[in-house]
């Protein structure tokens, strides 16, 4: 589809908080395959805090540039918890689509869950529900998670001729759209501390709004070591982010990089795997927030003590401990073998 007058109507709908740059990219990237965009915004964040109507104000000044964008206001007053606000927003958005765009395909996903153009094209005219694949990237467009988030697929495509689903179908078991390029989930994609702070404060995951996660020292630490800022040492990938070089960008990443090159990290971290594992251990300990770990993280930050000291010295100690444990294990295996042979 090249224009809003195309026979097949496709609507892209998503809730938004304050991510103007990423929203602008999503609109421009999908404009050739989507007829209309609907953005749901509220004066209350999912965490329950009062917020500015960023998108209503931004688009009001640019209505002539974006006649194919509609901003709808969602009243979240009276809702008592973060997840109720998130679900209500998504279902309000779904109700609006069904009442406004008859016989139309639609996308409902979070703003940072962006489908590829080929995913949208593959669904045009199809009267069915699907999830679409959006592997997760943290903080930069080319730092990919390697745990279960690599198979992230919570976004939904459907058709208004179908029955509405709870929560916009986000957690409904639906077939996965295959045979096309992946989209991308650009989570926490921000330029600086201020944007990261705002993301945490507005997030439905209120348990993650910890002061230590919003310090410059902490963010520099996780960026330099290219580790998950939520830790996840005990999960697949051990909280280590995978660096994707420019030559391996997919179409969506290339387009985003062309528009906002500072959303990409230039090079792979120079720290070794052992150093990065230790960094992931430190972050996991801090985020899990046992009392001692929180006191330790506060000490490092309040004293402006460099966490790099730990990352450079401890790997040597860690390596020694691992070697020692390995040697013990080998001796135990030899001992067991000898005992087994002697019994035989």
Where does each model-flagged region fall?
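Membrane-proximal basic amphipathic "stem/tether" segments
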Residues: 266-344
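Active-site-proximal specificity loops/subdomain of glycosyltransferases
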Residues: 45-104
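Short beta-strand-to-loop acidic/aromatic patch adjacent to the donor-nucleotide binding site
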Residues: 102-114
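Short loop->beta transition adjacent to catalytic acidic/histidine clusters or analogous donor-positioning motifs
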Residues: 10, 30-47, 66-71
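Conserved catalytic core of nucleotide-sugar-dependent glycosyltransferases
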Residues: 113-205
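Short, well-ordered alpha-helix to beta-strand connector turns
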Residues: 34, 66, 103, 126-127
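C-terminal catalytic/acceptor-binding lobe
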Residues: 135, 170-290, 312-317
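N-proximal low-complexity "stem/linker" segments adjacent to membrane-targeting elements
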Residues: 1-32
């Amino acid at each position: 589809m090249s224009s809003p007058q195309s026979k097949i109507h496709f609507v892209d709908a998503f809730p938004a908080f304050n991510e103007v740059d990423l929203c602008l990219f999503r609109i421009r990237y999908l404009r050739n395959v989507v007829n209309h965009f609907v953005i749901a915004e509220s004066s209350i964040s999912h965490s329950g805090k009062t917020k500015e109507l960023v998108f209503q104000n931004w688009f009001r000044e640019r209505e002539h540039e974006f006649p194919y964008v509609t901003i709808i206001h969602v009243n979240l007053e009276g809702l008592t918890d973060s997840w109720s606000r998130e679900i209500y927003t998504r279902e309000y958005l779904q109700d609006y689509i069904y009442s406004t765009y008859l016989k139309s395909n639609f996308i409902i996903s979070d703003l940072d869950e962006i489908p590829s153009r080929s995913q949208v094209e593959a669904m045009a005219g199809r009267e069915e529900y699907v999830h679409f694949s959006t592997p997760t990237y943290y903080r930069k467009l080319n730092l990919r998670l390697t745990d279960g988030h690599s198979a992230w697929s919570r976004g939904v495509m459907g058709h208004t001729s179908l029955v509405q689903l709870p929560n916009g179908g986000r957690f409904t078991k639906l077939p996965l759209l295959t045979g096309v390029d992946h989209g991308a989930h650009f989570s926490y994609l921000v330029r600086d501390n201020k944007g990261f702070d705002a993301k945490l404060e507005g997030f439905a995951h209120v348990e993650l709004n910890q002061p230590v996660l919003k310090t410059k020292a902490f963010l520099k630490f996780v960026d330099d070591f290219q580790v998950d800022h939520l830790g996840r040492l005990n999960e697949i990938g051990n909280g280590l982010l995978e660096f994707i070089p420019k030559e391996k960008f997919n179409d969506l990443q290339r387009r985003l990089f062309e528009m906002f090159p500072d959303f990409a990290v230039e090079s792979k971290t120079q720290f070794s795997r052992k150093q990065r594992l230790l960094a992931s251990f430190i972050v996991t300990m801090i985020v899990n927030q046992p009392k001692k770990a929180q006191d330790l993280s506060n000490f490092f930050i309040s004293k402006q003590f460099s966490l790099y000291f730990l990352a450079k010295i401890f790997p040597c100690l860690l390596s020694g401990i691992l070697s020692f444990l390995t040697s013990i294990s080998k001796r135990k295996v030899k001992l067991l073998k000898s005992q087994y042979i002697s019994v035989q």
